[in-house]
C-alpha cells in the first residue's frame, strides 16, 4: 500500500497505483516560477477558458495536490481542508473562498496538465519525466476534489450540497480535457476526523488522520466551544470567559460549615459547581477547583457543647457525612479542600496587612474590625451604597466598632472556646477572613471564578472583596466597568457566580417553617441521580422549587432516558472524534452560561431519535453527552431496578414474585397471575412482558 500525507490527512492507495505529490516536484517549482511573469501580466483579465486570472495569481502556476496513475486512468486529486476553520486565528472564512473555488480548481487542473507536458520534455529528474510520459499516455482522466468540511457547522458554512451545486454550475472541465477520451469529475465531501469508515465511495483509496495530527486540547476546546459566556454577578451581565491564565484556571467555592448534615441547599451548591467544573474541563481548561471547609464557627462551638463532644470529633463526623452525601450525588471531589483551622497563620498575616493599610483596626475588647468606609468600592457586588446598607440592613450594635457596618476579622477568646495566639491576644478568626486568606494562599492575589449560593452574595462575598483587595491592592481588569453608583469595579476575582435559592412548595426552606430537608432524608425516598437530575433541570441561577411532585417528575424523566439506553445499548462514542447536530446544540447550550435546561432538552430529543432508529452510535452519543454533566453513566437495568426501597420490596422479593407469576401463567392460573401483577403494581413495580420474558422496573 502506498501512502501520501497531505497536512493532517493520510491517503492510502492500493499497491498497483503509481502516486506522487505533484506540488513537491522539482520541475513543478521551476514551471511555477516561469509562469509567474505571465500571470502578473494577465492579472485581472479573463483567460480564453473563462478562468478568473485574478484568483491566487501571486503564486504563479498552481497544481493539484496528488496525481495517481492506474492502468490507463489519470487521477488528479485536489484537497481542500476546511476542517480547521474557526480553530486557527488566521484561518480564512469559507465564505471568502466559495465564489472563487470552481475557478481555482479549474486553473489547478489546467496548470497541472500543462506542467506534465513541460515535465515530459524538460524535467531534470528522470522519474518526473517518466511519470509525466505515463500520465499523458492515459486515455481517461478522473478528477476528485476532496473537501474536508468544517468541524464547527453553522449557517455561515455551506453544506456539502451547496458546494456541489456551486461546482456543478461553474466547474467546466471540457476546455481542459479535450485530448482525453473520457473525463470524470466528482467532489468528495467528508469530515474524516468524524467518520468511522475511512473508505470513500467511488474512489479506490482510503483517508485517515495520523496520530501525529491529533488536535491539541485547546483546538478540541474550540471545536465544541469557541466562546464560553458566563453571567458575572459583579457586572450583572454575561461576559465571554477569558481566564487570567488559560493554562491555569482557578475556581474557589465557599463550602460547608460542618456542624450538621448537609441540606438541599448544600446539595445544589455541590451539584452546580461540580457541573461547572466538569464543563470547564470538558472545554479543555486545566482547572484547579477549591472548595473550603469551615471547621471553626459559633455554630460549631455551640453544637459541640450541646452534644458533649469535642469540636474535632464533631467536625470530623460531619466532614465524613458531607463527603458521603456528595459522593452519592455523583459530585467529584474538589482538587483541594482547605480547612479553616489549618490556615490560621495566613489569616493573621492578612489581618496584619489590613491594619497596616489602614483598612482595619484593633478594638479595646481584643477584637479586630474591618473599617468598611475605608474601602470605596464596598457594596459593588450587592449593588448597594454604604448609605443604603446603613439604612436598610440590620447591623450588629457593638460599642467597640467605629461604624455599625464594620465587621469582625478577629474575635477575642472567650472562656471554654478554642483560641490561637495573635498580635491582638488569643482568639479566633471571623468567618469572612477565612475565605480571603485561603484563596490568596492557594491562588495568589487574583483568580478566575468565585462561586457560592446567592445567600452569600452579601455580606460574605462583599466582605471578601473588601478584605482581599484591601490587603493586596490587586484587582482583575473588568473592562472599565462601573457599578450603578458610578464607581469603578475593584475585585480580586474576575467572575463571581451564584446559584439560586431552593424553595419548598413555594416557600423559603428553613427550619423554623418545618420544611427543612437534609440530603439524607431526601435520598431515603429518591435515587441520588434523580436528585442530581432534578437540580440540573433548572438553570443554576434560577430559584428551584422542591416538592415531591417535582422529584417524581424528575424521576419519571430520568427513567425515560435510562429506558432508552436499556432498549438500545450504547456503543462506544468519542465526543472528540464525532460531531453531529446533537453534540453541537448540547455544547452551544452549555456554552451559554452553563445552560443545562437546554442541554437536557437536547438529551431528550436525542433519546427520541434513538427510540425511533435503535442506533447504538446515537445511544452512545446520548450516554457520552449525559456524562459531561454527570448523568446516565450507570447500568440502565441497575438504575431502573434500583432506587429507594420505599416501595417495601427488595429486588429478590420482586424476582420471586415474577417467577411465581410466570409459573401461574404456564399453569393457566390467570387469577393468580393477575393477583401478583396487582400486588406489584401496588408497590409501584412496572412489568413489561415481551418475547424474551418479563422485565421490570421501579415506578
Curated annotation (Swiss-Prot):
GO BP terms, alphabetized: cysteinyl-tRNA aminoacylation
What binding details are noted for the cofactor?
Binds 1 zinc ion per subunit.
PANTHER family in alphabetical order: CYSTEINE--TRNA LIGASE, CYTOPLASMIC, CYSTEINYL-TRNA SYNTHETASE
What keywords appear on the UniProt entry? Aminoacyl-tRNA synthetase, ATP-binding, Cytoplasm, Ligase, Metal-binding, Nucleotide-binding, Protein biosynthesis, Zinc
Q: Where does ATP bind?
A: 511
Names of the cofactor(s): Zn(2+)
User: Which ranges belong to the motif 'KMSKS' region?
Assistant: 508-512
* Residues reported in the UniProt entry to bind Zn(2+): 254, 435, 460, 464
- Tell me where it resides: Cytoplasm
Q: Which reaction does it catalyse?
A: tRNA(Cys) + L-cysteine + ATP = L-cysteinyl-tRNA(Cys) + AMP + diphosphate
Q: Which InterPro entries match?
A: Cys-tRNA-ligase, Cys-tRNA-synt_Ia_DALR, Cys-tRNA/MSH_ligase, CysS_C, Rossmann-like_a/b/a_fold, tRNA-synt_1_cat_dom, tRNAsynth_Ia_anticodon-bd
Q: Looking at the record, which segments are called Unknown?
A: 1-226
Q: Where is this motif: 'HIGH' region?
A: 256-266
CDD domains reported in the protein's UniProt record: Anticodon_Ia_Cys (cd07963), CysRS_core (cd00672)
Protein name, UniProt field: Cysteine--tRNA ligase
Q: What is its EC number?
A: 6.1.1.16
Report quaternary structure and partners.
Monomer.
One GO term of the cellular component aspect? cytosol
Q: From the Swiss-Prot or TrEMBL record, what is one GO molecular function term?
A: cysteine-tRNA ligase activity
Q: Which organism is it from?
A: Neisseria meningitidis serogroup A / serotype 4A (strain DSM 15465 / Z2491)
Q: What is its main location?
A: cytoplasm
Amino acid at each position: 500500500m502506498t501512502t501520501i500525507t497531505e497536512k493532517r490527512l493520510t491517503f492510502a492507495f492500493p499497491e498497483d497505483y503509481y502516486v506522487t505529490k505533484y506540488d513537491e516536484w522539482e520541475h513543478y517549482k521551476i514551471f511555477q516560477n516561469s509562469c509567474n511573469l505571465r500571470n502578473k501580466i494577465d492579472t485581472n483579465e479573463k483567460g480564453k477558458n473563462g478562468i478568473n486570472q485574478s484568483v491566487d495569481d501571486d503564486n504563479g502556476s498552481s497544481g493539484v495536490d496528488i496525481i495517481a496513475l492506474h492502468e490507463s486512468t489519470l487521477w488528479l486529486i485536489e484537497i481542500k481542508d476546511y476542517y480547521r476553520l474557526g480553530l486557527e486565528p488566521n484561518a480564512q472564512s469559507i465564505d471568502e473562498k466559495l465564489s472563487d473555488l470552481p475557478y481555482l480548481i479549474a486553473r489547478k487542473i489546467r496548470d497541472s496538465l500543462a506542467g506534465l507536458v513541460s515535465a515530459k520534455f524538460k524535467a531534470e529528474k528522470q522519474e518526473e519525466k517518466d511519470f509525466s510520459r505515463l500520465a499523458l499516455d492515459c486515455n481517461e482522466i478522473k478528477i476528485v476534489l476532496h473537501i474536508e468540511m468544517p468541524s464547527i457547522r453553522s449557517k455561515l458554512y455551506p453544506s456539502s450540497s451547496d458546494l456541489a451545486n456551486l461546482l456543478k454550475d461553474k466547474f467546466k472541465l471540457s476546455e481542459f480535457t479535450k485530448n482525453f477520451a473520457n473525463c470524470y469529475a466528482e467532489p468528495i465531501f467528508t469530515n474524516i476526523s468524524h467518520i468511522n469508515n475511512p473508505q470513500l465511495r467511488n474512489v479506490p483509496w482510503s483517508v485517515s488522520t495520523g496520530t501525529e495530527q491529533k488536535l491539541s486540547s485547546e483546538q478540541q476546546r474550540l471545536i465544541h466551544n469557541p466562546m464560553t459566556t458566563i453571567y458575572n454577578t459583579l457586572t450583572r451581565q454575561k461576559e465571554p470567559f477569558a481566564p487570567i491564565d488559560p493554562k491555569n484556571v482557578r475556581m474557589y467555592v465557599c463550602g460547608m460549615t460542618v456542624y450538621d448534615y448537609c441540606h438541599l441547599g448544600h446539595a445544589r451548591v455541590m451539584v452546580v459547581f461540580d457541573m461547572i467544573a466538569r464543563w470547564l474541563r470538558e472545554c479543555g481548561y486545566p482547572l484547579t477547583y477549591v472548595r473550603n471547609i469551615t471547621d471553626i464557627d459559633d455554630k460549631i462551638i455551640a453544637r459541640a457543647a450541646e452534644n458533649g463532644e469535642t469540636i474535632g470529633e464533631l467536625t470530623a463526623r460531619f466532614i465524613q457525612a458531607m463527603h458521603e452525601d456528595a459522593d452519592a450525588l455523583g459530585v467529584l471531589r474538589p482538587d483541594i479542600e482547605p480547612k479553616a483551622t489549618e490556615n490560621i497563620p495566613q489569616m493573621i498575616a492578612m489581618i496584619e496587612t489590613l491594619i497596616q493599610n489602614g483598612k482595619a483596626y484593633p478594638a479595646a475588647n481584643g477584637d479586630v474590625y474591618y473599617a468598611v468606609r475605608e474601602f470605596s468600592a464596598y457594596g459593588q457586588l450587592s449593588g448597594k451604597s454604604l448609605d443604603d446598607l446603613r439604612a436598610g440592613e440590620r447591623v450588629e450594635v457593638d460599642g467597640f466598632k467605629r461604624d455599625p457596618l464594620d465587621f469582625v476579622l478577629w474575635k477575642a477568646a472567650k472562656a471554654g472556646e478554642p483560641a490561637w495566639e495573635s498580635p491582638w491576644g488569643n482568639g479566633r478568626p471571623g468567618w469572612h477572613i477565612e475565605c480571603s486568606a485561603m484563596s490568596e494562599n492557594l491562588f495568589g492575589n487574583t483568580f478566575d471564578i468565585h462561586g457560592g449560593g446567592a445567600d452569600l452574595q452579601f455580606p460574605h462575598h462583599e466582605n471578601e472583596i473588601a478584605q482581599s483587595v484591601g490587603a493586596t491592592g490587586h484587582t482583575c481588569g473588568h473592562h472599565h466597568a462601573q457599578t450603578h453608583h458610578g464607581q469603578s469595579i475593584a475585585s480580586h476575582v474576575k467572575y463571581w457566580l451564584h446559584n439560586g435559592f431552593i424553595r419548598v412548595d413555594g416557600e423559603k426552606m428553613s427550619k423554623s417553617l418545618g420544611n427543612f430537608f437534609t440530603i439524607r432524608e431526601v435520598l431515603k425516598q429518591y435515587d441520588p441521580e434523580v436528585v442530581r437530575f432534578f437540580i440540573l433541570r433548572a438553570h443554576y441561577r434560577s430559584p428551584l422549587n422542591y416538592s415531591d411532585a417535582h422529584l417524581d417528575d424528575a424521576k419519571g424523566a430520568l427513567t425515560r432516558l435510562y429506558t432508552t439506553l436499556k432498549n438500545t445499548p450504547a456503543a462506544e462514542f468519542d465526543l472528540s472524534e464525532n460531531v453531529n447536530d446533537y453534540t453541537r446544540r448540547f455544547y452551544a447550550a452549555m456554552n451559554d452560561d452553563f445552560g443545562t435546561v437546554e442541554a437536557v432538552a437536547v438529551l431528550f430529543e436525542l433519546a427520541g431519535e434513538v427510540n425511533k432508529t435503535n442506533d447504538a452510535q446515537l445511544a452512545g452519543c446520548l450516554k457520552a453527552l449525559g456524562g459531561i454533566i454527570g448523568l446516565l453513566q450507570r447500568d440502565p437495568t441497575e438504575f431502573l431496578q434500583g432506587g429507594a426501597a420505599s416501595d417495601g420490596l427488595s429486588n429478590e422479593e420482586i424476582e420471586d414474585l415474577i417467577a411465581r407469576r410466570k409459573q401461574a401463567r404456564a399453569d393457566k392460573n390467570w387469577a393468580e397471575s393477575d393477583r401478583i401483577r396487582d400486588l406489584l403494581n401496588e408497590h409501584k413495580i412496572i412489568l413489561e412482558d415481551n418475547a424474551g420474558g418479563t422485565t421490570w422496573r421501579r415506578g
